[in-house]
Curated annotation (Swiss-Prot):
Endonuclease that resolves Holliday junction intermediates in genetic recombination. Cleaves mobile four-strand junctions by introducing symmetrical nicks in paired strands. Promotes annealing of linear ssDNA with homologous dsDNA. Required for DNA repair, homologous recombination and chromosome segregation. This is Holliday junction resolvase RecU. Mg(2+) binds at T82, D84, E97, Q116. It comes from Streptococcus sanguinis (strain SK36). CDD domains: RecU-like (cd22354). One of its GO terms (molecular function) is nucleic acid binding.
Amino acid sequence: MVNYPHKLKAKSSINRPVPGIVNFANRGMSFEKMINESNSYYLSRGLAVIHKKPTPIQIVKVDYPHRSRAKIVEAYFRQASTTDYSGVYKGHYIDFEAKETRQKKSMPMKNFHSHQIEHMEAVLEQKGICFVLLHFSSLRETYLLPASYLIEFYKIDKGGKSMPLTYIQEHGYPIEMQQLPSIPYLEIIEQKLLGGIINE
């Protein structure tokens, strides 16, 4: 069982199906898997080096039901997580979070936490490229929203209200899902945030 720093225990997900997994183009691929696949594609083509950040966990208790098998039964998050992904593209530091919802009209802001917002602000302070990838699974729509607009909306009431899809459409950029890369977000960064054309 994994516990958060404030000692609240997270529900165990061992041997339970993960809810909310969405099929894309009948391939049974989750949003996170599509992002990871896209990052692998960019890396293999020498376009960018972007990886999912590991979550630092402190193991507290391990059971050994068999001599050759160990089972972690209790652990704690060492620190609060920041964002999901980071890396470098053409000398620019890239940092982003990915969120998914089945709602059709808004993105729940409860999915974002104050320490993540503070981290994004710090990245922007250092002139890094920071954003969120927002996926509406019921609509099969994905958007890249610059972190500055997420931060602005979050500060209205500390993330108490959901972000309307209309706000995301007004300030963000739609991403058309495709074969490879599945989520071509680098094209948006290049064309909208850097003003150039990506060379593949």
